[in-house]
Amino acid sequence: MLSLSQPCFSGTLLMLLASNFLLWKNVAPVPMYASLDEYGEMSIYDLLDHVTILSHNVSELTAEMHRIFMEDVRYKPGRWFSDRYLTACHTSTLTISVSKEGARQMPGVFLVKEMISMLTAWRYPLYHIITELSYMEQAPDEIISRARNIEEKIIVLIEALRGILSKIQPGPPENERYPVWNELASLQSPDEDLRHLTLFNLFQCLVKDSRKIDSSIRLLKCKLLYNRDC
């Protein structure tokens, strides 16, 4: 069961490395491009295939991480969470839908910008999820390894989407805006139940958002390749 009472470091590094290695072996190989310039050398078709695979990987990993978390906490008396405990996600202002404003832009531009904003909004909370999990006594390695993997893939996915945006809207990059997560105090609270409730909310929101991204990328692919309402 998860506990934040004492840090437990014995053998953690080796187990994390092993877990990450096994996790990567079970995921379809996806090329990791380091910069926007390198993405510029890819065709729009290859980029769309690339982000489709990445987003599907992220969606699967978040679902697995959420499942492992729920299985772990259910054995702790009095620590069972339901959807009624779920607070508003910090990304709730991003609907990832084509509004009237978005409809006036070139096909897919508004959608790509919304997805970049949503993914960027998760970088800060994911960093702290990983940090706090690392201090948890008996925190399942499966959760930590997946959280790290998700963080890495989201960074790559953001860059790939920026590459797509540069192709469908050429010109200097615009300033990006994204919702800010402000629940760090709850995640670091001395109240153990509050810490777990905060994790529960984060995992629930991450699952929802990763599914939105996955479905939106399929929509994007349809719009850019076939230029029609999908």
Curated annotation (Swiss-Prot):
Keyword Glycoprotein: yes
MF GO annotations: hormone activity
Disulfide bridge partners, by residue number: C89-C205, C222-C230
Pfam families linked: Hormone_1 (PF00103)
Top-level division of the source organism's lineage: Eukaryota
GO cellular component, one term: extracellular region
Name of protein: Prolactin-6A1
Organism: Mus musculus (Mouse)
Gene this chain is encoded by: Prl6a1
